[in-house]
Structures are given as structure tokens and as C-alpha cells.
Amino acid sequence: LFFCSIFNFEFLIFNMSLREKFRGTGVAIVTAFNQDGSIDWHSFEKIINHIIEGKCEYIVVLGTTGESATVHGKEKQEVFSFVSKINAGRVALVAGIGGNDTHEVLEGFKTFDLKGYDAILSVSPYYNKPNQEGLFQHFKSLDAETPLPIIMYNVPSRTGMNVTGETQVRIARECKNIFATKEASGDFAQINYIIKNKPADFMVISGDDPITLQMIAAGAEGLISVVANAYPKDYSDMVRLCLAGKFEDAQKLHYKYLDIIASMFAEGSPSGVKAYLSEMGLCGNYFRLPVWKVSEKHHQKIRELMKGL
């Protein structure tokens, strides 16, 4: 009984510390490229500092927005190490390590040097469309071998398979190293179910910029944002206002950026946000195929929206 009490106390402290780090705004940072497809380290550093100076709480490295699907092997390690070096402990860091082969994800856990990182973001398996039990067993396997606390990521519009509310709550209850979900289903019935039924120490984080205000009103504890690559200060201010219950003030920022958010995703992400960053002089408008830049017509619309801010 004494041992169990000590364990539960330590686990509570562990999760309180995580909540302090990850309650607020995280940024799914883009990876800056040169025209030839090589990584543009100078621009990458500018974006890192831009986000940190904008007072966001943490940075997610090599998520979908970071074009992780086309960054490979040794290069991924170089990116992880570079961001950690430039960050120098200023904000919390999350490493994107996910995939549709459980064994390969576990190998990544073993081989990547994650010095300077506080957590891992792991997307649910994509393309092979496992059933709910397969999804649970995948995350259970990650939970057993992870070197860091995990944020699971549900984004069915990209993966092709929704991790249901019931499965997410089961993971939250049974996988103690998985402390949060980045929930991007856009399904408020599911979001409400998770928030209502999750353990008290499990965090729900918005994965949808345009509905973050509504998700926090329902009980979410922050956002992992694409938009905050370009507008970190205003967007993190909006999230902090929501978390403080100041929704009337938060709405002003929410509606200020609503058209900009729509434009960032209209022709795919990260195509949209990189168009904004290129206009700001933070990085070139370059990608790795099959991701491509937005049309010139849409880019002109982006320029006009920026002038209207």
C-alpha cells in the first residue's frame, strides 16, 4: 500500500510537470529548405527564434508541417539536434516520431538521440487502416518502450482511420506514458466524449487552428498550431486568453485570423504557411516533392490578406 501511494504521488507530480510545460501553444514548426531541396539551416534558425520570441510554450519538430515524410534517417537526427542546439532550453521541445510500422517507430525510439527534448508526438498509423484494437495495441507497444512521455496524434483526414473517442480514452487509462492527445478529428461529439471520460491528468490538445477557441471552451488545454509559425505572438496570446476564461477578448484575435487560417490550408499545408513565411522573409518558398507551393493566384490572395492585418 505504501509503495502504491508513493508511485501514485510520483506519477501525479510527473503529470503536473507535463501540464505546466504543455498547457498553451505548441508550434508544429516547418522545415526550411533551399531551392535544391537541401535544408536551409540559416532560415530554420530564424523561424525557431521567431517562434520563441513570440512567447509560444513549445515547439514540435518533424511533424506533418515539418515535412517529416520526406526527411530521412541521419537527416532527421540532424534536425532534432539542430533545433535542440538553437533552442538552448528556452522552450519545451517535442520530437515527431510516428509511422505505420510499429517496429520501425520503436526502432526510432531506440536510435534517435533526443537530448533536449521533453516529449514525443506520435501520429496514429496511416494508410494500412488498422482496426481499433490494432490502433490500441500500437500505442500500447509505444507506451512500453518510449524514452519520453508521448502525445498521441489523431488526424483522420491524413491517416485514413479515426482513433475513436472510446479508443483514445482506453489509451489514456491504460498507457501511463501517453499523457495527451493532439485531437484533430474536427468531430465535436468525439472531442466532448474524450474530455468527459478521460482521466483527470490526461491532456486534450487541439490539432485544429480554426476551432481551438471552441475546443478550449469545451475543456481542451491548448493547441499545436500551424498558424503560429507565422503569427506566434497573437496566436499564443489568444490561447492564453482562452485558458484564462477571457473568451470575449480571445474572440477578437480568433476572428482577426479566421480568413488567414483558411488561406493557409486552402491549397494544402505546409504549402500555405510557407507562403506566409516567405513573404515575411523568414524562409524560401521551397518544399520536397510531392509537396508544392500554392498557385500564384492564391499567393496573391495571401499578400492581400497580410496587408489587411
Where do the PLM segments sit?
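Catalytic alpha/beta core domains of metabolic enzymes, predominantly
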Residues: 144-145, 158-265
